[in-house]
């Protein structure tokens, strides 16, 4: 394994990849350029601060790993790695999946409540229902970036259990809203607490798993969104059979709110603030996890907040390209999640049957998602699955738009939904896996999800009642943005390929000159040996 070091920047520049090196007076570090002296007989000065640390890590890696992958980190085939992964898969993934399941259940139940008579009973008129759908995303967007940082400050048990308690109680309380104003208030509150869940789960899993282990595990979690939509339809159907003094939509909120509150103890007592302190690991495994962090390119448990990392994410064009792509993707996802029962009702099905007709759609979506996740991790690629999912969704939208036959339109909904979760999840995984330090990744994901969730503000206004039964405007806008997301995904491929080519040029030049490959821990994904995934 090659030695690594940081370099001062001489006058002749041959590359523009940013690194950090100490100032001449020994003051606080500042960003400089990694460069190589072109003049013969002149050697660039070496700074051994990172060299010593990386040499220690190299020794640790040799001790810990029986085999290594291309990045020089312990392979998943390492016996201890397998033990740790197995326990995380058994204990953490179900908890994260259930949390996301409950979040989506309470987020999208307004669609089922509407089919069950919500607007009629609380006297919503005109576009008031659409406004109630939309305002949820106003606070959801604002609290998205907060979730990633609160996770680090408060720790998973406290942060996640508080959010679950609050949005469960709010969902339960929604059963007793009497008018438009009250529904607006509870939707705003619900958006605030649910907005922190998805980014927190994403960041937590990126701390626990290596990026090549990430997609399949996240598929289990993200598919919970698909299953929650199916389960929500079943709950709505069951609530329609209850004979009581309350309305069907009230029972939907009561049942789903109580389910969420019932799971709070599992998060308050089942998680630990630090992964290595988890109750299900033995002493040997806890020690291994502490050492394992040192071989992960994307997490340092001792990392402290610094504005430098925030700025690194903000000025990275790849952050914004991913965010804009997610806006187009989520515009369809959020729109369909809330309005699908209404769209199916417009195809001629009764309200009760429409609730049931959503169940097999989301079940198939979950299966497709799992298949894509397995192959995405296996071939270590993200972009082909985003492109394929966007194309599939576009074809489905075109079928629903182009036909007036109810059976054909219902078939188009199946095609449409097979892609809406794959492209959204892979987009976030792609950015997360290609972003290094914790706070840089937290900022990048915050920006990404701010744009993605912001699309909910638009989706709530493009599927309006006056456009029934075909919703031509809403579906046409969704189709246009899917095509736009395909374009932005291609842009990201170009950007990552260009960065990888620059890094390869640096490595080749170092090898040619017999020099160690430069490294700085503060710029993890900017380092030459960090290869971006496509």
Curated annotation (Swiss-Prot):
There is a cross-link at residue 283 (Glycyl lysine isopeptide (Lys-Gly) (interchain with G-Cter in ubiquitin)). Residues 1-130, 174-187, 239-250, 345-355, 406-410, 466-474 are extracellular. The chain crosses the membrane at residues 131-151, 153-173, 188-208, 218-238, 251-271, 324-344, 356-376, 385-405, 411-431, 445-465, 475-495. It comes from the Eukaryota. InterPro entries: MFS, MFS_trans_sf. Keywords: Isopeptide bond, Membrane, Phosphoprotein, Transmembrane, Transmembrane helix, Transport, Ubl conjugation. SUPFAM superfamilies: MFS general substrate transporter. GO terms for biological process: carboxylic acid transport; quinolinic acid transmembrane transport. GO terms for cellular component: cell periphery; cortical endoplasmic reticulum; endoplasmic reticulum; fungal-type vacuole; membrane; mitochondrion; plasma membrane. Residues 21-56 are annotated as: Disordered. It is found in: Membrane. Residues 152, 209-217, 272-323, 377-384, 432-444, 496-534 are cytoplasmic. Involved in the uptake of nicotinic acid. This is High-affinity nicotinic acid transporter. It comes from Saccharomyces cerevisiae (strain ATCC 204508 / S288c) (Baker's yeast). The gene is TNA1.
